[in-house]
Amino acid sequence: MLFRSPIREGIQTEDVHFAYTDGTSVLHGVSFAARVGQVTAFVGPAGAGKTTLAYLIPRFLRPRSGRVLIDGADIARVTRQSLRAQIAFLFQETVLCDGTVEDNIRFGRLDASETDLCRAAEVAGANEFIRKLPQGYQTSLGRAGSKLSVGQKQRLALARALVRDTPILILDEPTSALDPEAEKHFLTMLREVSRTRLVLIIAHRLSTAAAADQILFLKNGQILERGSPGELLSHPGGAYRRYVDLQTRGWTGSEPTDN
């Protein structure tokens, strides 16, 4: 079955369980809903299952049991190609090709206009540094973007994801290599972008999580709390509030790397 767009409602998971082939169990009965026009942040310590949960939506992984629904349609019953045409996914590790700045952004959507490219770069906070490059958008980036800083690479990868103009946008730590000013700019622009999209963010920075409409706080493969940043912070004994308090005191967590 082909997936039909546009997406009008959102994503829902129902009692999702997931385990890797080696038997490692990662998700345990996860249920949540995220709506179009809303930014939802997956937050929690390393090993909580945030990335695994995000990977289920474009079917990079399949749940052991439970369902993932988009607008009420079980994604297991639609073609993978038609599903992924609805989703732009920004991975944690930035990968660039050896071409120009324009080549790297256009890779997200080959028929994108120059206006589309510039708009995506502006939202990603990349337009300013691109304009300062020797040939602007036609500047060659060298092998795997070797001429750019880590933060600049991440902004180009963000622009590539944004130029796809898909109804679902999934961002894995999108601000991890951005300085505070660039992060603030990106989060401000993301609010505008999210008006007509469903945005999921895997957030490690508290400032990124604070910009979300909804936080899903995960630990040990379960959602312990959900709500707006203000709601969760208003509970002194809550799991998210404790996590924030520990983070602000410099604790980084001792759990294994996130699956």
Task: Kindly label every feature range from the protein language model.
Residues 4-259:
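ABC-type nucleotide-binding domain
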Residues 1:
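Residue-level detector of conserved catalytic or cofactor/ligand-binding positions
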